[in-house]
Amino acid sequence: LDLLVTAMGQPNRLFLNNGDSTFADATATAGIGTRYGSSSIALADIDNDGDLDLYIVNYGAKSVLKDGGKLDIVRENNRLTVRGPYANRIKFIGNEMFEFGEPDEFYLNDGDGRFTLLEWADSRFKTHDGEPLTEPYRDQGLSAIFRDMNGDHAPDLFIANDGFTEDRCWINDGSGRFREISPLAIRQLSYSAMGVDFADINRDGHDDFFVVEMLSRSHERRLTQQGTVPGSSIAPGNFTHQPQSRRNCLYVARGDGTYAETAYFSGVAASEWSWSSIFLDVDLD
């Protein structure tokens, strides 16, 4: 077995197993040595060619706002806008300034220890309404997992994103091309998602999944955890809006491609400052 390691602001590394308990650093030829703020990885054969392809979740190697980046802010058409090198990282929503993350990276395995970076805007990735992406999402990514969510034997992809950036769910069409799941399939999102895992928790033959966040189990502590980001109004008739809440979310599959969010009903909405989760049979029942 070989070894992939992500790094924050340093090249992600590939170590090839020499077969004698030693490893050779093959990063220079692997094609994955970017310097983003990588937080985790997921592997699956998305194009059915017999080798594992690679998804790298990126957050941000540095914070533009906290590390003192110089911003060029102008007012255009009565709206505040950031220009220059940080235009993609810093955006105004209303009069509030928000810092976005770095784009995730999706690599196809060439089968010889090297990887080819996929372009987000090459029509391989489509929005939920079928339009090709024109630029990558810049989310604050923390975790990703491949799972066949719709039973077509092709690995789909779920990404848990921190902060206000929405979680992403990509459905594989079987050829390694992806389309965002309909917002009507997943109606509720966690606000600062940290980790995700899948399992069939009710034995109905369909995978369910759990996303962890940071809500305290103590009522007193919850009162000190209120965020400062103001709420946003939802226009009448906007039925595709997915509200984000500061708590865990448990998604139970209905069997028709949609999910019921049951964290409060199931008693798992709060688990303190949680970073990851995993399903396993602890009591052997």
Q: What residue ranges belong to the model's regions?
A:
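Acidic, glycine/proline-rich Ca2+-coordinating loop motifs
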Residues: 1-285
